[in-house]
Amino acid sequence: MREIVHLQTGQCGNQIGAAFWQTISGEHGLDGSGVYNGTSDLQLERMNVYFNEASGNKYVPRAVLVDLEPGTMDAVRAGPFGQLFRPDNFVFGQSGAGNNWAKGHYTEGAELVDQVLDVVRREAEGCDCLQGFQITHSLGGGTGAGMGTLLISKIREEFPDRMMATFSVMPSPKVSDTVVEPYNATLSVHQLVENSDATFCIDNEALYDICMRTLKLNNPSYGDLNHLVSAVMSGVTTCLRFPGQLNSDLRKLAVNMVPFPRLHFFMVGFAPLTSRGAHSFRAVTVPELTQQIFDPKNMMAASDFRNGRYLTCSAIYRGKVSMKEVEDQIRNVQNKNTAYFVEWIPNNVQTALCSIPPRGLKMSSTFVGNSTSIQELFKRVGDQFSAMFRRKAFLHWYTGEGMDEMEFTEAESNMNDLVSEYQQYQEASVSDAEEEYDEEAPLEGEE
């Protein structure tokens, strides 16, 4: 089977990762210690995409847990699913990266990275046919951002032909955890543009909004936010974990979603959104799900797709869903919102179906969109970056770890290029391609 090796780095990555494993263990009928007591053979059929079978009916996640300080790891180990993970797969330092990207990427993280790669190698050797890697991390901190991107590039070197998907938590406009977030995020995006095949952008502020607006939670905890993220991660990986009518794997997803290699930053959404503990008992219909996933309020990244256009998108439906109904709904959405889809990629919505719904729901759908409006997110970070970089604020923390200012300048211009590429394709139309931008067009008033 096509296995996936999962890495989680830094505090954010480990907490999201823990929520993800909790969600999919439940879907596959595993208890907190990895013992199978499920009811359906479908749960077992593709168990080994994410789990290794150990002796005695026990399943172990193919997960590598990385952090530069022991705190979060201890929390995961003490959590309800702490006994699930293989003890050797916890790799941690003692010093912490202190929200400093340079520490994670060049000094502290670089010392730990070989240890991590040994564990990754061992997990990869235990696979029949490794499909790729997925990594959960945040881009605003030191470990997840700095060391996470270091791991990605090292894994890229060693497994150049395997897929690399990242679930990256972007710094959000209003909710800021650290002052140097814009630096860390820009340096990370600089790496992700080159080394990742698919990056699912998640943003704390958008998650807060969903919690407050849709789920009616007054003061959402990180637990609630992670619950949302794990629902999306479980949805994106459904097709890999269960037999379905229309299956897709990481590579198929990427082939359908990435029209140009650098533009692989996706917005994600999930429906039906239900608050934790209050699983809705009302029936959900395909039209309702479709309407909900194409609703800007449901996007887990703080950018509004109505300000841009979709290059491609993918909708994954789970549960007892009729193919025809899905096709009709998707066609319906495209016809009503033609302005939001680029016309030079016909049929740019891909659908996948899986007959096993998530726990507690009759059906659900997950949305992955490659929209040019994601540039808002990069623009926002870029503006904050240049405001600080112009004054060289906080730079000594980075140069002190051996970084060069040049690297900041490169990262900044790479991110600006990314924004203008998105802009260029947003404005492109079918006829442009034929005319190939006539360079010598006379300026107004010159004729």
Curated annotation (Swiss-Prot):
Cofactor(s) this protein requires: Mg(2+)
InterPro entries reported in the protein's UniProt record: Beta-tubulin_BS, Beta_tubulin, Tub_FtsZ_C, Tubulin, Tubulin/FtsZ-like_C, Tubulin/FtsZ_2-layer-sand-dom, Tubulin/FtsZ_GTPase_sf, Tubulin_C
Heme among keywords: no
Binding site for GTP: Q11, E69, S138, G142, T143, G144, N204, N226
Source organism superkingdom: Eukaryota
Alphabetical list of CDD domains matching this protein: beta_tubulin (cd02187)
One GO MF term: GTPase activity
GO biological process, alphabetically ordered: microtubule-based process
Biased composition (Acidic residues): 432-447
Region (Disordered): 424-447
Principal location class: cytoplasm
Database matches in PROSITE patterns: TUBULIN, TUBULIN_B_AUTOREG
Keyword GTP-binding: yes
Subcellular location: Cytoplasm, Cytoskeleton
Residues where Mg(2+) binds: E69
GO CC aspect terms: cytoplasm; microtubule
Coiled-coil regions, chain positions: none
Pfam families: Tubulin, Tubulin_C
Subunit comment: Dimer of alpha and beta chains. A typical microtubule is a hollow water-filled tube with an outer diameter of 25 nm and an inner diameter of 15 nM. Alpha-beta heterodimers associate head-to-tail to form protofilaments running lengthwise along the microtubule wall with the beta-tubulin subunit facing the microtubule plus end conferring a structural polarity. Microtubules usually have 13 protofilaments but different protofilament numbers can be found in some organisms and specialized cells.
Sequence similarity: Belongs to the tubulin family.
Name of protein: Tubulin beta chain
Organism, as annotated: Zymoseptoria tritici
